[in-house]
Design a protein with these regions (language model features):
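Conserved active-site tyrosine of GNAT-family acetyltransferases
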Residues: 21-26
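Generic hydrophobic, aliphatic-rich segments that mediate packing or membrane embedding
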Residues: 69-72, 89
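Vicinal oxygen chelate
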Residues: 15-20, 77-92
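N-terminal beta-strand motif that seeds the catalytic metal site of vicinal oxygen chelate
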Residues: 1-19, 73-76
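Conserved short beta-strand elements that form part of the metal-binding/catalytic scaffold
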Residues: 32-70, 80
Length: 92
């Protein structure tokens, strides 16, 4: 049985409007914006020492065809203790 992840590293979410989404996460959850790139991305965290726990990525008119209109979860990244743990999980 593979070892469990240590913790959730971050989530990446596709949004239609990064400015509005950033404001929502700041107002509702009190997240800190670590880095903001208008019209493209916001990297946010509950902990000001972290670079990001939530990454908001705007899908604009120039998004690849397979991504147009596909707002929502893009990926989650989990922290594991070692590369061997990752390999075990992959094989499972």
């Amino acid at each position: 049985m593979p070892k469990r992840p240590m913790y959730l590293q971050h989530v990446n979410i596709y949004v239609r409007n990064v400015e509005r989404s950033k404001q929502w996460y700041e107002d509702l959850l009190g997240l800190h914006t670590y880095e903001f790139r208008p019209g493209w991305a916001a990297f946010m965290s509950a902990d000001e020492e972290q670079s990001h726990e939530v990454a908001l990525m705007q899908l604009g008119d120039d998004a690849p065809l397979q991504q147009k209109g596909q707002v929502g979860l893009n990926h989650m990244a989990w922290r594991l203790a070692s590369l061997d743990d990752l390999k075990d999980l992959y094989r499972h």
